[in-house]
Amino acid sequence: MCKMLHEISRELLNWKEIRKVKWENNKVEVKEFLEKDSLKFDFSDDCDYTKDSSYKSMSGFTKYFAYKTLDNVKDPDSNSTLLQEIYKVLWPELEQKDYMRGKGWIHSDTMTSVQHTLAKYFEATFPNEVKEYLLNNPRQRFVSVRMCKSMYEQFSTVSSYLDSNADLKRFVSLYHTLGNYSPVPTGFNVARSGVGYSSNYDYWDLTLMKIKKYFDLRKKTFLKRADDVNQIAILFHYEETINNCMKWLDGYDSWNDFVEQYFFQDYVDDEGEVIPFCTGHSWKDGCNEVGDYDEFFKNAWNRIEARSNRMISALKKKLEKN
């Protein structure tokens, strides 16, 4: 028995040493991040496998279109080691949750995507240019990212208008910054983004509305296994993803606790209600699409930047404390 206890104690000491080494390694990389212009740091730069530095020197729409079309620039959700180190500092407990990890990687999601809204914006803002492009490219069936890129390069009316839209430019420039990323359970990213379903609902305000509904219904124990499951089922259409999401959310005492832990304070009002990205944006039929693009772009970038500030502040405090 004494020998067994000795072995257990030694294993615990070894684990503590491993955790200490991991923490020190995490601190070094995160400290270097904080020494940069961390509020504007583009995490796709951490996933740039091109042979020169031209991608990192890009900005605005040019960089966004390059990210979407270059094979050698990867998705930060699944490729940024820096983002992973930040997650480990802010949420160290997630490393022990099997429903949050895969092959040693904490699952991540880009909260508010650009492309779906940008494509709709092109259709609404440049109908003549879209029509002309489709006539000249009969094999093109819908407004894709490559079509947006080509139109930006070919039509001066498009490029000058986009470049003059300050809120849209700011939204695009903050797309890959810290405040637009969140750890999520296994399967969350693919299910929410619309593979086999619909990217029309791939908006973080809509996602938070359903998550809040889940927490609201969780208070009513007689409804718990029925209606609250349905709220998550609306977000996802795979049983495993639903179960993982419920495990994730059930790890928090309340909606307010969840909001605080994930730095979503700027996405809710003083009463804890989710603030839509634009007036009328909701899960109701016909209301899931953006009605006012200017309002959407302004609110989206403001919330991303505000959350980045909160996360950066929390990182500094955690590093100082440890």
Regions inferred by a protein language model and the residue ranges of each:
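Intrinsically disordered, low-complexity N-proximal targeting/linker segments that flank membranes
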Residues: 1-166
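Intrinsic-disorder/low-complexity regions
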Residues: 13, 24-25, 36, 41-47, ...
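Phenylalanine-focused residue identity feature
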Residues: 33, 41-43, 61, 65, ...
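Intrinsically disordered, low-complexity regions enriched in small/polar residues
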Residues: 51, 66, 89, 123-124, ...
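C-terminal substrate/ligand-recognition segments
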Residues: 80, 104-115, 119, 123-127, ...
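Feature representing long, continuous alpha-helical segments
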Residues: 120, 146-149, 153, 160, ...
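Glycine- and acidic-residue-rich phosphate-binding/metal-coordinating active-site segment common to enzymes
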Residues: 164, 169-170, 174, 201
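C-terminal, well-folded lobe of enzymatic/effector domains
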Residues: 193, 198-322
